[in-house]
């Protein structure tokens, strides 16, 4: 969504529509023929190339997420920019795309972290906002909530019953 030519962080966008409605246009499918709209997101954020990225991490945590998540370009091998999840941007994407169901992926990348952060708002010129601003050229300072990590290998789990309490708390927090 953030790379969409009309709704993304212009001018750091691609030349086409990447939102759900763009799929309808590209495929010649009427919007009323779509039932559910699945929003698929990572448990953390990434960005390729230039452009605003309020939650980008420039430290060993960002490097660790990049390494554990195998966040390198498939063609160039270039390292992707990594950061904590940005719930303000996620809510914006949900609204623009008309998402009816969410699917989180790559939560196992966060398995080893003692603490996990989630951006719930931004500070712009000292004022806290909880919506995605039209002009993001000015510095957006992320406002974080810290959550306990689950420090458990999620890749070995066979059912939801095995999920650690901290992981379930993270999911509940994201759902709210």
Predicted regions and their residues:
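Non-transmembrane, aqueous-exposed alpha-helical and coiled segments at domain scale
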Residues: 1-176
């Amino acid at each position: 969504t953030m790379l969409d030519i009309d709704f993304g962080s212009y001018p750091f966008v691609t030349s086409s529509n990447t939102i759900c409605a763009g799929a309808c246009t590209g495929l010649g499918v009427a919007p009323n023929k779509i039932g559910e709209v699945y929003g698929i997101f990572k448990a953390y954020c990434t960005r390729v190339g230039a452009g605003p990225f309020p939650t980008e991490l420039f430290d060993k945590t960002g490097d660790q997420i990049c390494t554990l998540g195998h966040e390198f370009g498939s063609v160039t091998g270039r390292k992707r920019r990594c950061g904590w999840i940005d719930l303000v941007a996620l809510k914006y994407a949900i609204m623009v795309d008309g998402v009816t169901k969410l699917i989180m992926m790559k939560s196992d990348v966060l398995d080893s972290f003692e603490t996990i952060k989630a951006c719930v708002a931004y500070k712009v010129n000292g004022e806290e906002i909880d919506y995605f601003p039209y002009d993001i050229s000015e510095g957006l300072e992320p406002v974080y909530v810290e959550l306990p990590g689950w420090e458990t290998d999620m890749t070995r789990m066979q059912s939801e019953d095995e999920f650690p309490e901290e992981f379930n708390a993270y999911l509940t927090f994201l759902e709210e």
